[in-house]
Amino acid sequence: MDPSININLLGAGKVDLAIVQLDVLKFVSELMQKEADFNVFEQAKVVLNLYLEEIHVITRNEGLLSLYQLEDKKVAVGPQRSGSALSAEVLLAGYDLRVQAVFDAPNDALGKLKSGELDAMIFVGGAPVPAFENLDDSFHLVRMPANNVLEQIYRKQKIGRSVYSWADDSETYAVPSVIMTRERNDRECVATLQKLLIAILLNKETLDSTGHPKWKNSFIRSIVGNAGYRPAVDVLQIFDVLEGSGYRIIKK
């Protein structure tokens, strides 16, 4: 499910957990305060750091090599108010670019790239994104030049042939994704959430070997500061102390 929709559902109390791109929070915070009386930065807390999600800018146009060349081009940015669309807005503003934005989902956008109806598409997701793995050599990634403003928001990253067989190494940016919950002290909910967190930590090796490749580079053991959900932070700290003392936690 889309990260922007996720945080909206969390704020409305319709879900207990939400996977969120951190750059999305700035966009939705004011709207959620107005529509749901939900203060994202005070009432939403990080349960678990996940991994970096790369910004993919993909084209079949051989003349589009740098992001600056997207000026006035027709570019799919994902469904309206989606995480990809919001990240695309930040990205394009950072480069002071104007494009003809099309709000197509990734699979629709790929079809239109093949037919020539679109010049490029922007999508944010942890590489490798399954929809992009089997593209042919007529596709390539558009390079993102260094940008001091964007580097305050995103992390510099490279995607290339080691991830996608059709892609040469290309500079891009990535955004951290996290699992968030509402600040609350319901004992049953806290216990359930802690059990889930423990299950993830205990099965990290299985996730590394059989899950998405991003699990191998995840940040799930990193402890969040004031933005962290206290019951989750407690679990992470206990794991760190025990493993630091030479103990290995196993499920009975």
Model-predicted regions and their roles:
Residues L10, A36-D37, F41-E42, T59-R60, ...:
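Mature, folded catalytic cores of secreted/periplasmic enzymes
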Residues D108-E117, M121, G125-D136, L141, ...:
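An extracytoplasmic/periplasmic, membrane-proximal ligand-sensing/linker region
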Residues E53-G111, S115:
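Bilobed "Venus flytrap"/periplasmic-binding protein-like clamshell domains
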Residues K14, I19-L22, K26-S29, N61, ...:
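Sec/Tat-exported extracytoplasmic proteins
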Residues M1-S4, I19, N61, G78-L86, ...:
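Soluble non-cytosolic domains of exported or imported proteins
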Residues M1-Y68, A76-P79:
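Short, glycine-/small- and polar/acidic-enriched structural segments
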